Amino acid sequence: EIWLVNHILQQASEDLLPAIWSAKYDASDEKTSLADSFDGLGTIIKSAKDAGEIAAGKGNVVSTGKFTRADIGTQLLNMWRHMPERFRMMNSKLYLPFAMGDLYDDWFADEHPNVHSPKQSPDETGQQFLYGTNGKVEIVRCSGMPENSSFAMLTLQQNVAYGMDKPSDMRTLKAVPADYKFKALGKYVFGTQIATLRSELFCTNGQNVNPLDV
């Protein structure tokens, strides 16, 4: 019984990770999956774009088009250089799909085959930083985005938030007495948010997390 409870909790945690970007809240009775229970970061960004809160005119979009092996490093560096000087003096995070992280590695290998400077080479460091930023921009590879997504988001770590009612909610499952069957009940209250979309602290490249979203 203890093993089964732990297994269920582990599965719930694994299901939550990819949903952080792709989840879309739906209150319909037939929508009961984790991906229907809250708005993920990608959904929040898409809604803000539709509302005009994320736009080139607002200064928080640097259009890159679809990334390629030949240009991804240059395009990402352009995003960072677009930001105000005060932002560039701070440590920031660059959120990418896993596949785009791999594409960046390929670009780096092509452009800088003999560079092994600290905080620069993907093969030399435990943390990967965007080349040309002097270690100011850490690349964060994110689960839950489609492989063909060219999405990129640059901001401060503290600007991206998630929260739950109590952290213990995701670690608590109560068994319910029942004959011949194992039943258990659990609950969670979870949500994601971007604190501000102001161009001084936030920038995206105009691509949706899910390329099929229009």
PLM region descriptions:
Residues 12-19, 99-111:
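Charged, low-complexity, helix-prone segments enriched in Lys/Glu/Asp/Gln
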Residues 8, 94-97, 139, 184:
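Short low-polarity hydrophobic stretches
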Residues 1-78:
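Alpha-helical scaffold segments that mediate packing/assembly in large oligomeric complexes
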Residues 36-70, 102-214:
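Sequence/fold signature of self-assembling virion shell proteins
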Residues 70-107, 118:
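C-terminal interaction module
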Residues 18-28, 88-92, 119-122:
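Short glycine-rich, low-complexity/disordered patches
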Residues 2, 90, 178-182:
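Residues at beta-strand starts and edge strands
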